[in-house]
Amino acid sequence: MGNMFANLFKGLFGKKEMRILMVGLDAAGKTTILYKLKLGEIVTTIPTIGFNVETVEYKNISFTVWDVGGQDKIRPLWRHYFQNTQGLIFVVDSNDRERVNEAREELMRMLAEDELRDAVLLVFANKQDLPNAMNAAEITDKLGLHSLRHRNWYIQATCATSGDGLYEGLDWLSNQLRNQK
């Protein structure tokens, strides 16, 4: 009984929690984004084999962010992280025009999974600081985001190294969580 009141109190006044899965092709900037959000600084990264997981506190929400490696050989493992995921962050290297179709295929494959049917989608169009980077509208088109029905999605132009756009993305996620019944 006491536990019920504690949960009610936490629900009304305490932190909300959101489980986030962050994926994307290798070298898109996922790990850099994770640690920029967690530590506020740029860290030296190596390709992620497996995953990194961190809790990021922002606006009274505790985001548990799973950063899963994006190399093609380990992408089949992404599905093991789908369960209970409320938000999906898909990171795209906006400068990598050659692999944007590959990114689209991976994104659409994931969104077809039953375990992710209720997850909201945030796309980070990363590396906007590079001179040849596609803007958010172009990434939206290339990923086919307008074709998504029955799913809340948002695209945010970002630069992981400066932090530009990252918190705007978290704002959108936190608003989505607040609007869930």
Swiss-Prot record:
Keyword annotations from UniProtKB, A to Z: ER-Golgi transport, Golgi apparatus, GTP-binding, Hydrolase, Lipoprotein, Membrane, Myristate, Nucleotide-binding, Protein transport, Transport
Origin: domain of life: Eukaryota
Localization per record: Golgi apparatus membrane
Catalytic activity, as annotated: GTP + H2O = GDP + phosphate + H(+)
Lipid-attached positions, N-myristoyl glycine: 2
Main enzyme class: hydrolase
Pfam family, one: Arf
Residues that coordinate or bind GTP: 24-32, 126-129, 160
Principal cellular location given in the protein's record: Golgi
PANTHER family referenced in this protein's UniProt entry, alphabetically: ADP RIBOSYLATION FACTOR-RELATED
Name of the featured protein: ADP-ribosylation factor 1
Record organism: Xenopus laevis (African clawed frog)
